[in-house]
Amino acid sequence: YDTGYPPEGEGVCTDVIWYAIDNAGYNFKAMIDKDIELNKEEYKLIDIIDPNIDFRRVSTQYTFLKRYVESYSTDYEDIMEFNPGDILTFDDADHIAMVSDKRNAKGIPYLIQNRDETQEEKEEDRLEITDMEITGHFRFTYNNDIKKLIKSI
């Protein structure tokens, strides 16, 4: 896509994340693009920088989150650690989703995600039945590192 952003109604799992962060008042694409520009060596899977797609790759978002935000427990049974808006990565850099404010009868949160074309709802009770391993649990909050990065844009 010329602007990097997919048309309304289209998207992959990473689009849920940048869309939510953008709607919280941050330009996630600009922050990622700037961090790649300043620290390309940290983004191991990027050979050639392409601002039209880099921010939409799970591996890129995973690297950015590891660098800038707090990490939490990856054990979904530790339900008190999971807050609405938390970001989860699966199988290192294969999938990414957001924790919903909705929970099932056991208290386990739903996920908001673009999983595949057959998916009927974006908000699903799938956390405890997924065959993917949670490899990252992040909470995007405004902190000094984010503040410094935003000022450099």
Mark where each language-model region is.
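...with weaker cross-activation on analogous glycine-rich loops/strands in unrelated enzymes
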Residues: E37-E117
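Short regulatory "switch" loops immediately downstream of catalytic or recognition motifs
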Residues: N27, D101-R103, F140-N144
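N-terminal capping segments
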Residues: Y1-K66
